[in-house]
C-alpha cells in the first residue's frame, strides 16, 4: 500500500511556528483542534477543551450540574469551574469519572460545591496505586518522554502538542496539586442511575484503561466516552502500558455506534455532532482498529516478524482523510507490533531475538564488524543527509555507536541528531516528544537519571495502603544480597499489620502472621524511610522504630533493598 506518510523522507513538510518549534506541518495544524474552548454541545451540555490533557464536561440536571472528569490537578479543575461559572451559576452536585487517568482535580469541587455523589469504576483506586508504586519509575519516565514534559516552550525542540491535548499539564496550572477524591458510588457492570435528576446509563467500555466507561444521557441524546479520540486510537503507548486488546475496544465502539447519538463528547478533542456524520466517522474509526488487528493476524499467520509487520501493514489512504484517524498521537507501525506481542508474546520468530547478546556487547561487535567506529560514524552522517529509509538506518547506526562501552560525546551527539531528524519529520506527537526528550538527555540539556531509580514522593507514599507501602520492597531487591537469607518479617505501623518474607532471593508479601521478627512504629517514620529523608538503622537507633526478634538478621534482610533508606 506504499509509504504511510507518517515519517517524511526529507524536510519539505517541516515548518517552524511563531515560537520556532520545528515539526511536521500537519502536527502544527493539529494544535488548532486542541485550542482552548468552552463548547456548548447543546442546551445544558458544555465541554471544555484545551484546559489540560483531558476535557472537562458539564451537564445540567434538574438538581444541579454533573461534572465529568476532573483533570490532573486541583488548579486545572478550578480553571474548568471558572469557565463553567461564565455560562451558569448552578451548583455542581455530582461527579463522574470516565476512567482513572483524569481524577486528580476533584478536591476543587468538594471544597466549595455541594457534591452529593461521586461515581466511578471500582478499579480506579487499584489502577492509581499500581501506577504509583511498583512500576512508578518506568511509568513516570514514560510520561515524561511521551508527553514532552521536560521539553522547552520554544525553539526547534519546543513542545508543539501531545496529540490528545496541548500539554500533559498546562504551565499556568502550576504547581498542579493532586486532589483525587475516591468515588463513593462504584460500578463494575452496566447500570442505570439517577444523578442530579438525570438518567445516566453506564456501560463498561475498556479502551486505554480497563476501568473506562461510556456514559449515555438519553435526555440530551449525548454520549460521553473514552473511545473516539482526535487521532488514531493508541493501541500501543510509547510510554509503556498494559496491552489494549483491539477486540475489546471494538465492542465499546460498536456499543457507541448503537446509541445513535446526536452528540459525542470524548475525553479528548472537540465534541462531535450530527447523527449521520457521526455514524460515518465513528464507523471509519472503528474499522481502522479492525483493519490493524485483522492484517496483523493475517501477516503473522504468514510468518511475518514485528519489523516486517511494521512495513507491510499500512493504513489505506481513506483513513488519512479524517483527522480522527490520522496518526498525530501514535503510529500504526507501532500498533501492529503491539498487537502481535499481545497475542503471542515478545518473540516474533526472528532468530536474532531468540538468544540475543547484551545490548552493549552486540553494539561493540557490530561496529567492529562494520569496520570500526570511525567508518560507522561516516555512514551515519551520510545516512542523515539521505532520504527514503536512510533516516531509519541512521538511527540504527547511531544507536549502536552510542550503546558501546567506549561511546564518545560525538557518538551521543550523532544519536541526538538522528533522533531530532525523526522528531521533526514524524506526524506523531508521541514519537516527536520521545525522540526530543532522549536527544536532550543525550546532549546534556536535561538530566533523566533521577527517573531511572525508585524515587518516592511524600504525598505519593502517604496515599498508599500499608500493604502497598511494604510490598513495594519486592521490586527493590538486590538478589545477591539475599544469599542464604530466610526471614519472615512482620511490619506493624500505627497498629496495622502486614509482612514480607525474604527467601530464595525474593521478598514475598505476606499478612505478617507467625513472623519470626516484628518491626513496629509510626507509619510516618516508614514513609520518611521510603522517601529517603530517614533510614531504617537511624530510625531504630533513635527509638522511632523497634524490632522484636533477631535485630541483626532483620538488618541483614533489609540491607538487600536497593534504596538509600535501607542500605
Give the residues covered by each predicted segment.
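Divalent metal-coordination and catalytic microenvironments
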Residues: 44, 59, 69, 84, ...
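Active-site metal-binding motif and surrounding structural segment of the metallo-beta-lactamase
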Residues: 33, 38-41, 63-64, 75-120, ...
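Short, hydrophobic/aromatic-rich segments at coil-to-beta transitions
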Residues: 41-47, 186, 197-201, 482-490
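Conserved beta-strand hairpin/beta-sheet module of binuclear metal-dependent hydrolase folds
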Residues: 35-88, 214-227
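Feature captures hydrophobic
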Residues: 393-396, 403, 412-567
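Metallo-beta-lactamase
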Residues: 19, 64-66, 72-74, 126-204, 248-260, ...
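Accessory terminal helices/loops
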Residues: 2-28, 136-141, 149-173, 258-263, ...
